[in-house]
């Protein structure tokens, strides 16, 4: 695959899980002879929600919740056919969203 690049974006709520998945991807790509750029940490998205705990009055009684979405970016430069096959067979954790683009 001359002049190819595989860009892998990972999203997860658990930072330990996403770091483990990126380590597996990088190790697999390096083992098959491809150049790897990354993992590059992208900005973490924080979504905050405020909910009233009282059903009627007492507006001061509130709970606050936060969801953090962690993101990582891995570029595989000049992948071989063995690299693509190994990445297709790779089994990642269930809590990690993976987006792959060729370019």
From Swiss-Prot:
What Gene3D superfamilies does its record include?
Answer: Ribosomal protein S10 domain (3.30.70.600)
Q: Which GO terms describe its biological process?
A: translation
Q: Name one GO cellular component term.
A: ribosome
**Keyword Acetylation assigned:** no
Tree of life domain: Bacteria
One GO molecular-function annotation for this sequence? structural constituent of ribosome
Keywords, comma-separated and alphabetical: Ribonucleoprotein, Ribosomal protein
Pfam families reported in the protein's UniProt record: Ribosomal_S10
Q: Which InterPro entries match?
A: Ribosomal_uS10, Ribosomal_uS10_CS, Ribosomal_uS10_dom, Ribosomal_uS10_dom_sf
Q: Which family does it belong to?
A: Belongs to the universal ribosomal protein uS10 family.
Q: Its quaternary structure?
A: Part of the 30S ribosomal subunit.
- Known role: Involved in the binding of tRNA to the ribosomes.
- Listed name of the protein: Small ribosomal subunit protein uS10
Q: Provide the taxonomic classification.
A: Bacteria, Pseudomonadati, Pseudomonadota, Gammaproteobacteria, Alteromonadales
